[in-house]
Amino acid sequence: MLSYWRQYLAISPFYLIFTVFSFGPVFYSLYLAFQRYDGLGAKQFVGLQQFEFLWNDPVFWLSIRNTLLIWVLSTVPTLFGALVLATLLHSVRRFKGFYRIALYVPNVTSIVAVAIFFGAVFSNNFGLVNAILGTVGISPVPWLSNPWLIKVVIAALMTWMWTGYNMIIYLAGLQAIPTSIYEAAKMDGAGPVRTFFQITIPVMRPIILFTVVISTINGLQSFSEPQVLFASNAANQNMGGPGQAGLTTLLYFYQSAFLLNDYGYGAAIVWAFFVLIIVLVVINWRIVQRGRKS
């Protein structure tokens, strides 16, 4: 290995720059979490005071509840829908490439454009959904003013964007399963439903675990969705809508750090949220691993 020191020396500037610009801000944010800093004046060390205030901050816990509920409402249908679509697409013989691209397009579409589209579709007064409901005699639904429906709309937006991404991953896993396994199951009299739950799901467990972890991380990082969704209302743009029903933790971090210039408190928010994400990822991992062993 030492014989290649010249080669390592040649590529070392890239890794040094990468380390500085990647891990430097991470450690600096941890440093800020123990400081009171408004971005202009001198920093003041306050120890764990930021985290103590965070623990007693009702808005922080509201943002945590909103984030977790949106995560559940989006992750479950996303993964289930992706697995169903991948299974159906796996059995398609014609136009498979077209369907694959069409279902994946939402994931590469600008999240701002998608949020604006959903805001127009679910608008309380002029939305497409309420217009359709009106044709069958149903009164307009307050999609963007009801606390629960706000979360449903944000979850639907995230589901629409990420289902295709997970579907591609599941489809790759399905294509790697030998056809001989399905042929043997068919000879034993197993129907499609039994084959799906007793063969496809067990074989796909490692891939499902991967998508659960990735979806957990992505689902908990919702920020642009509620911000852009309420961008037309200046009073609610960075508050998560009426009653802060769509205020996610990252949106609260943005509000605290960049709108109120409380960078120390903003850093404390993201580090507390980082710990929460790690805990949830570990719990998901344990649950899936336990199911795999059983």
Feature-to-residue mapping (PLM):
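A structural signal for multi-pass alpha-helical bundles of membrane permease subunits
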Residues: 3-294
